[in-house]
A protein has these predicted regions:
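Short, compositionally biased low-complexity segments
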Residues: 52-58, 87-98
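N-terminal interaction modules that seed assembly of large macromolecular complexes
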Residues: 2, 14-73
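Eukaryotic N-terminal accessory cofactor-binding modules
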Residues: 2-14, 221
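Charged, amphipathic alpha-helical oligomerization/scaffolding segments
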Residues: 11, 15-22, 41-48, 52, ...
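Short, charged/polar, low-complexity loop and linker segments
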Residues: 67, 95-107, 132, 136
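Acidic, proline/glycine-rich low-complexity IDRs
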Residues: 3, 107, 122-221
Length: 221
């Protein structure tokens, strides 16, 4: 028991708990954010969460009873729907690093909102039990969270990070291209425009070039 107590109060465990709690709180208030803010913050907190999880000391369960959970189906669905609404048309993405790819030669469609909700469920259940302050259950919740990091939510985190990176940087490129295409009308060179059949700049009584050609003034109005 003493060894388990030392593990749960390890510096790396405390740092992971801190980041994990902030991650959960961040997702819970995400529906009030702009998508750009949500994406930017996610791209910062997800790598940190992965880093802290990878630095956890080895931990094994010591109890036999199932641990309490916090995330119900209703809580999960509310969060997923909120995140899906926030991401809108940028929610879906293609992924190849999933077990189902063994049976398919095509990329599989996943969603950022569902992956984040899955990660949230593991992390929130861990935080809920850990904050109860009972050494044995704290230890076991840490062990389960660590195991699930390796087999479940760690890979989902990496996949989601790639998708969010694509949303942020490819979206900015698309917006820049659209902005360049909009443009505005630029009159032709005076001499070139005066070669058009409808131009009367070369009539004997024409004074167009005293102040520049005005052949296309009507087009600019």
């Amino acid at each position: 028991m003493e060894k388990e107590s030392q593990t749960i109060f390890d510096k790396n465990v405390i740092e992971f708990v801190t980041v994990a709690a902030e991650f959960c709180a961040f997702l819970e208030r995400a529906e009030r954010m702009k998508r750009s803010t949500f994406v930017d913050t996610s791209l910062k907190i997800l790598p940190l969460l992965y880093l802290k999880a990878s630095m956890l000391p080895k931990c094994e369960t010591i109890g036999d009873e199932a641990l309490e959970t916090y995330v119900t189906e209703e809580i999960y669905e509310i969060l997923r729907i909120n995140l899906s609404g926030l991401m809108a048309d940028k929610d879906d993405y293609l992924v190849v690093f999933v077990q189902d790819m063994v049976y398919s030669d095509q990329p599989i469609k996943k969603s950022i909102s569902e992956d984040l909700a899955d990660i949230y469920q593991d992390i929130k259940d861990f935080i809920f039990v850990f904050q109860l302050g009972l050494n044995e259950t704290m230890n076991d919740s840490l062990a389960i969270c660590q195991e699930n990091f390796g087999t479940l939510w760690g890979q989902k985190l990496v996949n989601t990070l790639r998708a969010l990176h694509d949303v942020k940087y490819n979206q900015e490129e698309e917006e820049e291209e659209v902005g360049n295409e909009e443009g505005f009308y630029e009159p032709s060179d005076d001499n070139d425009c005066c070669e058009e059949d409808g131009c009367h700049c070369h009539d004997d009584d024409c004074h167009c070039h005293e102040d520049g050609c005005h052949c296309h003034d009507d087009e600019l109005k």
